[in-house]
Amino acid sequence: CALPISVNTWLGLAFERVCMEHVDQIKFKLGISGVLTEVNSWYCKSDPDNGIFGSQIDMLIARKDQVINLCEMKYSQSEYTITEKVDRSIRNKISDLRVVSGTKYAIYPTLITTYGVVENSYSQELQSVVMLDDLFA
């Protein structure tokens, strides 16, 4: 059954908060427990003149091995489906991060979701998927 928008919004925010409290478990699932990291969220305003779309990134894991996991946190009542719109949003976030920060690090799109992801052409672009169960393993 579909939940009211306000409830779904609350669940999404609560899920993001749980994820932020379980960074060590996320790093373990990604196989980077032993890598020195800095974890933050990130935001930039739109600036069309400079090719910046405007982005809010739920979690960035900047790794000492010159990789950034760009983590999208998505609450869903079932497997999450990456649509063309979501794929474009992730690509825009990667572009914004590169342009604004000037990073030369590799950027790995990473999905953190409740029940995994529906396999499709867009999900193939993800480097990693972390599920709710992984946070409590």
List PLM regions with ranges.
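A cross-kingdom feature that marks ATP-driven nucleic-acid transaction machinery
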Residues: 1-137
